[in-house]
Amino acid sequence: MTIMRKTHPLMKLVNHAFIDLPTPSNISGWWNFGSLLGLCLMIQIASGLFLAMHYTPDTLTAFSSVTHICRDVNYGWLIRYIHANGASLFFICLYLHIGRGIYYGSYFYVETWNIGIILLFLTMATAFMGYVLPWGQMSFWGATVITNLLSAIPYIGTDLVEWIWGGFSVDKATLNRFFAFHFILPFIIAAVAMVHLLFLHETGSNNPLGIPSDCDKIPFHPYYTIKDFLGIVLLLTFFFTLVLFFPDLLGDPDNYSPANPLNTPPHIKPEWYFLFAYAILRSIPNKLGGVIALVMSILILALLPHIQTAKQRSLMFRPISQLLFWLLVSDVLVLTWIGGQPVEPPFIIIGQIASILYFAIILILMPIAGIIENKMLKW
């Protein structure tokens, strides 16, 4: 008698993806973040669905409806904080997942990597539109500033911005369409994530050594299901500590004031997970140049497979590249800090140096380090 999971059309799909999947025997905890991102997406879709039942996308009542959720709906405050902090958790896992991909050379699975970049853009768009929905001060002004960047596009810029706004400023039409897009995009993200997995399972997982592991594979279940489960328990422990004890730690106090088009906040800034890109945008005095740098700060990831000069895939045995990788991580943290500071000395020059360093490490220093390391292999 054949096992049902190997014959049933639906079970067979699950079996090939999560049960009998041949997996390298030496992948570390850094490979847990894929499953954790899946968990984050499920948390966001579930909590978002319940919030959408009580939220009204109208400029007059949006702020009040969020207040109503927190005060009058059973456990509404909990659902709201799970959703708000779930976005932060999503981006923490996302950045760690990308960092692992860069460190261990996973970007050589080009299709999987490029779909991952598309997923990053979709997630950033979803998070941005979600931040607008509570219609607080930072929601309104964040939406105004970020959508206004599109006006830097030559010739069609102004028309494009007014088309997105649905008028001559951020108003009811903007809020309404942002809610519609914010609702549908997570489902698109889930579908694209399936394609991401499909391409990954075509090649199999990478491993810390960056070498083919066909000779030493083990089944995904039970070895990695139990490992993923441990990751999930640790993640949820951290997450609920954040939600229940420090729910406003990562938020902006300005968003507790209703949106007022006549009163500009002293310092407009996005959520913490966009601050590194925001700092790069602000460090260039030209508007169009800033927008190009902003987009390139993410798109540059797509160049990684094409600019590697080292003969080894992983950074595990490449000390110079390791040093540059951790310099890049530090640089992104500096950019995140600068993005949250006002535009005044010495923050301006620090931001400009950090922005130049960000692109220089990836485009210039990493390839040079690869060439030096190739020569070191011959000694």
From Swiss-Prot:
What's the domain of life for this entry? Answer: Eukaryota
Keyword check for Transferase: no
Q: Where in the cell is it found?
A: Mitochondrion inner membrane
Give the GO biological process terms: mitochondrial electron transport, ubiquinol to cytochrome c
PANTHER family in the record, alphabetically?
Answer: CYTOCHROME B
**Which family does this protein fall into?**
Belongs to the cytochrome b family.
What name appears for this protein in its UniProt entry? Cytochrome b
**Organism of provenance:** Dipodomys microps (Chisel-toothed kangaroo rat)
